[in-house]
Amino acid sequence: AGAVVGYFAHKYKENPPVMVVCEASAADCLYRSAVQADGNLVNVTGDLQTIMAGLACGEGNTIGWDILKNHVTVFASCPDWMSAKATRIYANPLENDPHIISGESGSVPLGLAYTALHDEDAKDLKEALKLDENSNILVISTEGDTDPVRYREIVWDGLYGTTESLSKDFFYNNMIL
């Protein structure tokens, strides 16, 4: 995340895009670090159980954190259902959109964008992301279906369906001064 954010922050110095870091809520160290707002990293310990196994680290990279804390607009702590929903969206495209096989860790940015656009409880997030009908959204998935059995359970069987409400504080707008 630090390398991608650093690239876009450097390339578009005068008008940087809105940049978001999505984490599994069970291991949301960067989100917690941003909320703490003292510039230091917070480690998450204990049960880091999540379907987003690639994001279940609980510890941020100190070099990357320096870039992220200064350039990321929103840090999001995302529930598993948000990732699962996006995995299904990628697998079942509309009209001429391509079919994409994305694992759970790679799907969560699309899940956050979809939630911001379609969930009334996420209207503050939509505002923080400056999303409207003219927005262009780039989501980056860095993972295929690393667990084919789990992927099929999510896509075919509806594992981790949307059954929870969003927590009021599931995202942090890092750019509020």
What is the predicted function of each stretch?
Residues 1-70, 120, 125-171:
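Glycine-rich phosphate/pyrophosphate-binding loop at beta-loop-alpha junctions
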Residues 59-129:
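Active-site-adjacent helical/loop segments in soluble small-molecule enzymes
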Residues 174:
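Short acidic/glycine-rich loops and adjacent helix/strand connectors
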